[in-house]
Regions:
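N-terminal secretory signal peptides
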Residues: 1-27, 39-40
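N-terminal twin-arginine translocation
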Residues: 22-30, 38-60
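Early extracytoplasmic/lumenal segment of secretory-pathway proteins
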Residues: 62-144
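A structural signal for short loop-to-beta-strand junctions that line the ligand-binding cleft
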Residues: 64, 132-139, 157-197
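Ligand-binding pocket segment of bilobal, Venus flytrap-like solute-binding proteins
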Residues: 148, 224-227, 232-235, 244-312
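A bilobed periplasmic-binding-protein/Venus flytrap-type ligand-binding module shared by bacterial periplasmic
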Residues: 196-203, 237-242, 319-334, 350-353
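Mature extracytoplasmic/periplasmic domains
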Residues: 326-401
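Conserved C-terminal helix/tail region of periplasmic/extracytoplasmic solute-binding proteins
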Residues: 391-431
Length: 431
């Protein structure tokens, strides 16, 4: 634990976060859009499948992760997705990584190297296909087609389950044994969130709490609704009562029919890859599909009291960004030590207070409440109120009943599935 370490005041770190230009991290993730599949995933998978030089059967996690950690870890993550602050000279640094290095003597080269899953995946392709070190010891990839490709083609190491005691003790139930990675064989969650409904209460004409409200001009007006291209198919199926994980072309067409009905109703302003949050805060959208952390940030930390994020009555899409160790990584022992370090509640809370997404460590709630009370005792009332609001938000600390109303969405594992999916859904958002 790093509770005894000399850490910066959380008010300083987070107030600095408030002043930054808030990029939509999930928007960055989606930025390349579905069209990025043109990287040639199908051919890529076929090429990998023929390369049996690095078969998972030959991977011995005990051997891979059993040595002494090296003195440097290369960590590829998304922009603005970790705790940042500034020193007295104005230089930006990451307190949690500074503390890790003090404790272990291991230097961490943290790079905001990932702008989208498909783009980053494509950059790694030559080294992965050749069985070479990618230069990264930890990468962060979202559950979905690229995560599935990395695992199925044995391009990430299976983890040693004896090397993550903090994960075993503190990880949320939803973070353990996820359907897309049974028994966490290859991954540990970094952060997570939900896709639901963001609303501007100044513009809606009645409660917008279910999907059909977003197709009703009497509630949302005309030309004032945003939809997210990548999440839309799964999200619509969930809200039609369809289980996307077991869905097929018939269900996909049912979802597409609803989307066409919504488009024909004249409510759509734009189908977004990213940037929806700018239009929501600017008053250009009355309602939009939205990622939970984005609206929470603007409402809680930036004073947009007119915004709300609603969990749809029909359910929400649950996405998870996952830490993985690429095959042939130079320092797997160091990588898994750092991955497990982030499952200490104090460390995880430092990240949560900065990024405001769903933490895989539920005990961060108590830590943040303690920080809020400490800030309140020091008369940092505005700051303490924000921390209280963060810790008490049910969408950052969901109960089992809420999680039961979510789905990870459809895993598309074959070229035929991907092609049919795209043929059904792409014309709607691109038409």
């Amino acid at each position: 634990m790093n509770e005894g370490m000399d850490r910066p005041h959380r008010d300083e770190a987070l107030m600095d976060a408030m002043m930054r230009a808030r990029l939509t991290r999930r928007g960055l993730l989606k930025g390349a859009g579905r069209g990025a599949a043109a990287l040639g995933l199908g051919a890529f998978l076929a090429a990998c499948a023929s390369n049996d030089e690095t078969s998972e059967a030959a991977f011995d996690p005990k051997q891979i992760f059993g040595g002494q950690p090296g003195d440097k870890i290369n960590f590829a993550n998304w922009p603005l997705y970790i705790d940042y602050t500034k020193d007295k000279d104005g230089n930006r640094y990451i307190p949690s990584l500074r503390d890790f290095s003090k404790q272990t003597g291991i230097d961490v080269n943290f790079q905001e190297a990932i702008q989208s899953n498909p783009e980053f995946f494509g950059k790694l392709q030559p080294q992965l296909q050749a069985g070479q070190d990618t230069g990264w010891d930890i990468i962060v990839i979202t559950n979905g087609r690229y995560f599935t490709a990395l695992v199925e083609n044995e391009w990430v190491y299976p983890l040693d389950p004896t090397k993550h005691p903090n994960f075993d003790q503190y990880a949320a139930k939803w973070a353990k044994d996820p359907t897309y990675d049974p028994n966490n064989k290859h991954s540990m969650a970094w952060q997570s969130g939900f896709t639901g409904i963001g609303v501007n209460n100044d513009l809606i004409k009645g409660p917008v709490t279910k999907m059909d409200d977003m197709a009703n001009p009497d509630k949302v007006g005309t030309g004032l609704v945003g939809m997210l291209k990548e999440d839309m198919p799964d999200w619509v199926m969930i809200n039609l009562g369809i289980d996307p994980t077991t869905s097929g072309p018939a269900e996909w067409k049912e979802a597409a029919a609803w989307m066409l009905k919504q488009r024909d109703a004249g409510v759509i302003r734009q189908y977004y890859d990213q940037g929806y949050i700018d239009d929501l805060t600017a008053g250009n959208l009355s309602a939009t599909m939205a990622w939970s952390g984005d609206v929470l940030y603007y409402k809680t930390w930036s004073g947009y009291d007119n915004l709300d994020w609603n969990f749809p009555e029909g359910g929400a899409l649950h996405w998870v960004d996952n830490m993985l160790v690429p095959a042939e990584a130079a320092n797997p022992a160091g990588a898994i030590e750092l991955m497990d370090y982030y499952y200490q509640p104090r460390v995880a809370a430092d990240v949560t207070e900065w990024v405001l997404y769903l933490s895989p460590v539920p005990d961060t709630q108590d830590v943040i409440l303690k920080d809020a009370k400490a800030a309140e005792a020091q008369n940092y009332k505005g700051y303490s109120n924000k921390l209280f609001a963060t810790a008490e938000n049910p969408f950052m600390y969901p109960d089992d009943a809420l999680l039961a109303r979510t789905s990870y969405g459809r895993e598309l594992k074959t070229d035929d599935e991907r092609e049919e999916w795209d043929a059904i859904f792409l014309p709607i958002s691109q038409g």
